[in-house]
């Protein structure tokens, strides 16, 4: 009987959840940045091996909310934990041992799903982590086979939920918006990427190339000027970087048109969050 189930990738911000998801599925799906809190919405990646299908969900980092967007991120992370068949609880190997997930997530009760502690970034640790966890390095691939084998034991017997050739469940337009944000994290400095959101206004696959028109939202006029840059240089560079990422994912040429608008205090405004796809 085949096995199939959801695996939550949970933990504090910047512990390597997105990098691990990408390494497990063999595709760049989730935003990766040295800056914390880059993941705002769960990203689902699929791995099918022989008679087992893993539905990995990269969740926002567990944090103490400072404003309404953080509240939605925390709520999304807790839903991922609550819905999972098995939880991969990530913690940096260099900071072992890991505190209990129930404390980090401030849960009222332990999760119903079994928890496997995963010590990430093992290539950066000076010493092996303590027993009771699995050390992995998404960079070198060390420990990934052991992690997959351990997770497989907890998947329920079930037919596959998705075609074995599929790698993701979300539409391309979702990843297009995410890759625009990833480019912003790469090219913009300090706090500006946290004030930026992206909305896909038009997505057209035919005729070629794939045409995408998107709006980049910031909170202040001064931020708009920075994102556009002198003579439009910054927004052009951002668009080029994002277009390359999208084209690589879908293996098709892409024309990406970006506009920049101000949406004041959108991170603290429930209707704006809903409009931008962040459930309140």
Where are the regions that the model predicts?
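Conserved G1/Walker A P-loop phosphate-binding module
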Residues: 1-86, 91
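Conserved glycine(s) of the Walker
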Residues: 16, 143, 234
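Solvent-exposed alpha-helical segments within well-ordered globular domains of core cellular machineries
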Residues: 22, 41, 45, 75-82, ...
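Conserved, well-folded catalytic cores of nucleic-acid-processing
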Residues: 27, 46, 50, 80-87, ...
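Catalytic P-loop NTPase motifs of RecA-like helicase/translocase cores
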Residues: 39, 62-64, 96-97, 125-126, ...
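Conserved C-terminal guanine-recognition region of P-loop GTPase G domains, centered on the G4
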Residues: 46-54, 71-135, 187, 204-208
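Canonical P-loop GTPase G-domain recognition
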Residues: 112-172
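P-loop NTP-binding site
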Residues: 172-280
